[in-house]
C-alpha cells in the first residue's frame, strides 16, 4: 500500500513543480516595472523609467494601461499619475493573464470590441501588438492592429534611413503616406522620431509635416512633445557664446602675441564686421585709433562686389560702348525715361511722307539738335 501511495504522490509533485516553473518570474538584481515586471530596458520601446517612493514603472506602461486614470497635475506624482492609482492598477492587472507569456500582471487590453486579449507591453511588442500615443492611447493585438498596404515586392528593397534590407514581416515596416515608394523599418522611424521630437519630425524625403506625422502616430510611432535631442545636450551651443580672440594679420606687431589684446587703444582686437571669425589688432592692420570696423581678406572682395553692384544698379556691362561719357538710359516708359528717344523725335507724317512735310518740321528738328539737310532747306 505504501508503494501505491508513493506512486500517486509523485505525479502531484511533478505537476506542482511544473506550475511553479510557469508562474515563477526571473528575479532581477535591479528595480523592475510594477506593471510589466521588466527592467528599465530601451527608452525608445518602453519609455523613461520612472522611480519615486519605492515605486518603479515605465512611462509607456503608465499611459497605455487600460484602467489607470491621470487625476493629478503634470508636476504631481509620476507625470500626473498618482501613486495610489498606480498601485490599484497593478492590483487589477495581477488578475489578468498575458496571452503571450501566460503570466499574470497584464495591464494592457486590446481595445477592439469583444476582444479579451491582455498583454504586457514588452510581450505585446514582440508579438506584433500596436499601441497609439495620441488621443485615448489605445492598444491593439496583432489581429486587430491598424495595417498598411505594403506590396510583397517591396520586401526585397532597402530602408531609406539605414539602407539595409527590409524585414519580411510587414509589421516591422512602415510605408510613407506622402512618398508611397519610401518604406522604413519601424525601429528606424522610432529612433528618428525620438531624436527629432515633435518640432522637427517630418518626412525624410519631401519634408512633409502634416500627413507624415499623423500616419506615423496611427501606426504606433511615439513622437515626444519636447525639443530635439541635439538641443537638450548640455553645452550644445556653448561655442556660439565664445568670442573670437586671435589676431590674423600677416605680421602681428603686439609683443605679447596674437592671442593677447587690450580693451582699448592700439592693441584692441577688431573682429571682421561680416563674418566675425577673423580678427586683427588696430596697429597690425594700420587702422585708425578710433576705428571699430574692419573686414578680413575673405569677406572684403564680396563686400566690394556688393557695393559696386548697388552703385551701378541695372547698368549693363556694355554701357560704355553706347556713350562713354554719359550714363546709359534704358528705353522704358516716358515717366521713367527723362530723355526723348529717336523715334519720339520723328513725327509719323514725316516718316510716312517726307515730301509732304512742311517747314515747321525742320524747325522742330533744329530744336532737337539735328542738322537739317539741303533737301529740307529747298522744300522750305
From Swiss-Prot:
Gene3D superfamilies: Zinc/RING finger domain, C3HC4 (zinc finger). The keyword Transferase applies. Keywords: Metal-binding, Nucleus, Transferase, Ubl conjugation pathway, Zinc, Zinc-finger. Zn(2+) 7 binds at residues 272, 275, 296, 299. A zinc finger (RING-type) spans 159-207. A zinc finger (C2HC pre-PHD-type) spans 30-68. E3 ubiquitin-protein ligase which ubiquitinates histone H3 at 'Lys-14'. Required for male fertility, via inhibition of SPOP-mediated BRDT degradation when in the presence of acetylated histone H4 in early condensing spermatids. Stabilization of BRDT allows it to facilitate histone removal in early condensing spermatids and promote the progression of histone-to-protamine exchange. Promotes the expression of steroidogenesis proteins in the testes, and as a result plays a role in maintaining testosterone levels and repressing osteoclastogenesis. The extended PHD (ePHD) domain is required for interaction with the nucleosome core particle via binding to DNA. The C-terminal PHD domain is required for histone H3 substrate binding. This is E3 ubiquitin-protein ligase PHF7. It comes from Rattus norvegicus. Residues 1-23, 352-380 are annotated as: Disordered. GO terms for biological process: negative regulation of osteoclast proliferation. Residues 150-306 are annotated as: Required for interaction with ubiquitinated UBE2D2. Residues 352-367 have a biased composition (Low complexity). Zn(2+) 4 binds at residues 159, 162, 185, 188. SUPFAM superfamilies: FYVE/PHD zinc finger. GO terms for molecular function: zinc ion binding. A zinc finger (PHD-type) spans 96-145. The record marks 149-150 as: Cleavage. Zn(2+) 1 binds at residues 33, 36, 58, 61. Interacts with MEF2C; the interaction promotes MEF2C binding to its transcription targets. Interacts with GATA4; the interaction promotes GATA4 binding to its transcription targets. Interacts with UBE2D2; the interaction inhibits cleavage of PHF7 and promotes association of the complex with the nucleosome core particle. Zn(2+) 3 binds at residues 110, 115, 141, 144.
Amino acid at each position: 500500500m505504501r508503494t501505491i501511495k508513493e506512486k500517486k504522490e509523485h505525479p502531484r509533485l511533478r505537476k506542482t513543480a511544473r506550475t511553479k516553473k510557469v508562474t515563477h518570474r526571473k528575479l532581477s538584481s535591479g528595480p523592475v516595472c510594477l506593471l510589466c515586471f521588466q527592467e528599465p530596458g530601451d527608452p525608445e520601446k518602453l519609455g523613461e523609467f520612472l522611480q519615486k517612493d519605492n515605486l518603479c514603472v515605465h512611462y509607456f506602461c503608465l499611459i497605455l494601461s487600460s484602467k489607470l486614470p491621470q487625476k493629478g497635475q503634470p508636476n504631481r506624482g509620476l507625470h500626473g499619475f498618482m501613486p495610489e492609482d498606480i498601485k490599484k492598477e497593478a492590483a487589477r492587472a495581477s488578475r489578468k493573464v498575458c496571452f503571450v507569456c501566460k503570466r499574470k500582471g497584464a495591464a494592457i487590453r486590446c481595445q477592439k470590441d469583444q476582444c479579451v486579449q491582455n498583454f504586457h507591453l514588452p510581450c505585446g511588442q514582440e508579438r506584433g501588438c500596436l499601441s497609439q500615443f495620441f488621443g485615448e492611447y489605445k492598444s491593439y493585438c496583432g489581429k486587430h492592429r491598424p495595417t498598411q498596404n505594403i506590396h510583397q515586392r517591396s520586401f526585397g528593397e532597402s530602408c531609406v534611413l539605414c539602407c539595409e534590407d527590409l524585414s519580411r514581416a510587414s509589421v516591422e515596416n512602415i510605408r510613407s503616406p506622402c512618398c508611397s515608394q519610401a518604406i522604413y523599418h519601424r525601429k528606424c522611424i522610432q529612433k528618428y522620431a525620438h531624436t527629432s521630437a515633435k518640432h522637427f519630425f517630418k518626412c525624410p524625403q519631401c519634408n512633409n509635416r502634416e500627413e507624415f506625422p499623423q500616419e506615423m502616430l496611427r501606426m504606433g510611432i511615439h513622437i515626444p512633445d519636447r525639443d530635439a535631442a541635439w538641443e537638450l545636450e548640455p553645452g550644445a551651443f556653448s561655442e556660439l557664446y565664445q568670442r573670437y580672440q586671435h589676431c590674423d594679420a600677416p605680421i602681428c606687431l603686439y609683443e605679447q602675441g596674437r592671442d593677447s589684446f587690450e580693451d582699448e587703444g592700439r592693441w584692441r582686437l577688431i573682429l571682421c564686421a561680416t563674418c566675425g571669425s577673423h580678427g586683427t589688432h588696430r596697429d597690425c592692420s594700420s587702422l585708425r585709433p578710433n576705428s571699430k570696423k574692419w573686414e578680413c581678406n575673405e569677406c572684403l572682395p564680396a563686400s566690394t562686389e556688393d557695393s559696386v553692384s548697388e552703385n551701378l544698379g541695372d547698368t549693363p556691362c556694355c554701357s560704355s560702348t553706347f556713350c562713354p561719357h554719359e550714363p546709359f538710359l534704358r528705353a522704358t516708359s516716358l515717366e521713367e525715361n527723362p530723355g526723348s528717344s529717336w523715334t519720339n523725335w520723328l513725327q509719323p507724317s514725316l516718316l510716312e511722307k517726307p515730301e509732304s512735310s512742311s517747314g515747321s518740321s525742320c524747325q522742330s528738328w533744329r530744336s532737337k539738335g539735328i542738322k537739317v539737310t539741303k533737301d529740307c532747306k529747298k522744300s522750305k
